[in-house]
Amino acid sequence: MLKFLLPVDGSDTSNEAVAEFIKLLDWYKEEPEIHLLNVQFPQRGNVALFIDKESINLYHQDEGMKGLQAARGLMDQAGIVCQFHITVGNPEEMIIRYAKEINCDQIVIGPRGLGVMKGLLLGSVASKVMQLSTIPVLLIK
């Protein structure tokens, strides 16, 4: 069974990539295993001095669920079973690490996300994942 990792952040381009990927699933003889991944940026500065770790973890979980919501809805609408995950860290590093952990066959990613670089043709996260990953990457525009 093929295993796909789709990093999503809740952006329009991320959700469009999920919608296009769903259309491609007809090409496969058997239903693949699909993992949605949302990566939250770690809290910076002195936040931990004022907010307890549990509250920070809850914040990351809440924001991660928001980032996954539309993609999960698209999968549900199409009747596709998927697993979803939320992690915290540097997005490109966490995407590649998680893809290796689950032994995925391909990373499917949109060209841009919610980051500062969203106006560029190819966002920095997608670009770095394509450069650094030893796992094949499918960029869906």
Language model segments and positions:
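Absolute protein N-terminus
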Residues: 1-2, 141
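Phosphate- and divalent-cation-binding pockets in alpha/beta enzyme and binding domains
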Residues: 16, 94, 116
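Class I S-adenosyl-L-methionine
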Residues: 22, 69-76
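Structural beta-alpha unit
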Residues: 73-107
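A short acidic, glycine-rich active-site loop
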Residues: 54-66
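Gly/Ser-rich helix-loop-strand patches that form or flank binding pockets
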Residues: 97-141
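General small-molecule cofactor/ligand-binding pocket signal
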Residues: 35-37, 83-87, 138
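Small/aliphatic-rich secondary-structure junction motif
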Residues: 2-51
